[in-house]
Amino acid sequence: MGCQGNKPPIALFIAGCAVVLCLLFPHAGPGADGHPLDRFVLSDTDIPGFSIIRGPDYYGPESLWNYIDGGALPYLDYGVRDVVTYTGLWKPDSLEIVVDVYDMADSRGAFGIYSNERFPGYNFIEIGIEGYLTDNSLCFWKGPFYIKVFTREDSPSTTAPLDSLAKALDNRITGSGGMDAYFSFFPEEDRLAHTEAFIAKNVLGQDYLSRALSVNYKRGEEEYQLFLIMNKDSGTAGGNFLKYREFIRQYGEMTEKTVSGWDESFIGRESWYGTLVFVRRGQFILGSAGLSDEKLAQSHLKALAAGLPR
């Protein structure tokens, strides 16, 4: 029947096995045509004293589970596109170092997964857009990339090789792709450093709320958060606002107070987040969670909204 005819059963079986293997296991190498992340695979030529002893291995969204198991879920939520990982030996100290490079497709996704894994008390360093150093790891993000350089030793004698490798990787990222411009609209008063976050899904514990920016604040002994939730259009935002308002009405406490100057608003209280002041303008939902001073919360939201497109 020619080239377009039906394949015999054994051929179909072999083809099916090949598809399953491709999904379950990473590529052992870049292949004849190379891989988009090959430029991040360092060698002794790039870093004298460093040589790869395992890998590189390449993963995609379908196979990342095989590398980091359940840890893959947040990476998938933030839009991971490609991953390369390899282990090298730092010969001067006989130290094995692992390099993970995550291509998160865009800078918002890279920052999002970075912000999901870092804590405000970390030792932050100047690398990429932002990075931090622990006893055995150096992690940073820049553009669409989130990069982790670490050793499995709890307390290596030196972190100098981590720094050398990270700087070499940083230099291979063209452009900046820095912090989301919307963060500049969040008020500075009471703002806590290194608490900015991009939340991809389940904002405020609600599965219908996604794509939010948040910043933590502290006033006296009271800690609170400001949220900017981005929706695709005003209709979607209105529907989501209604759902959240009804959730608070049912499971929290809803007051009769409203905030003037917005498309919609409510003031309520919830056991986990405390006092809530939420408003909507067009496609944006803005909220204060945990600040008992309702007037100050309204002032913060007004300042945040001043920079948003109408």
Regions found by a protein language model. Name each.
Residues D38, E153-Y182, L291-R310:
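Surface-exposed amphipathic alpha-helical segments
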Residues M230, G235, R245, F266-R310:
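C-terminal functional regions that serve as terminal interaction/effector modules
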Residues D44, G49-Y78, M104-G143, S184-L209, ...:
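Short Gly/Thr-rich strand-loop-strand
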Residues C3-I14:
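Bacterial N-terminal signal peptides that target proteins for export
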Residues L76-Y114, V149, S214-N240:
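A short acidic-to-branched-hydrophobic micro-motif
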Residues C3-G5, V19-H35:
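Bacterial Sec-dependent signal peptides at the C-terminal "C-region" and cleavage site
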Residues D100, C139, Y146-V149, F278, ...:
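Structural recognition of the beta-strand scaffold that forms the well-ordered cores
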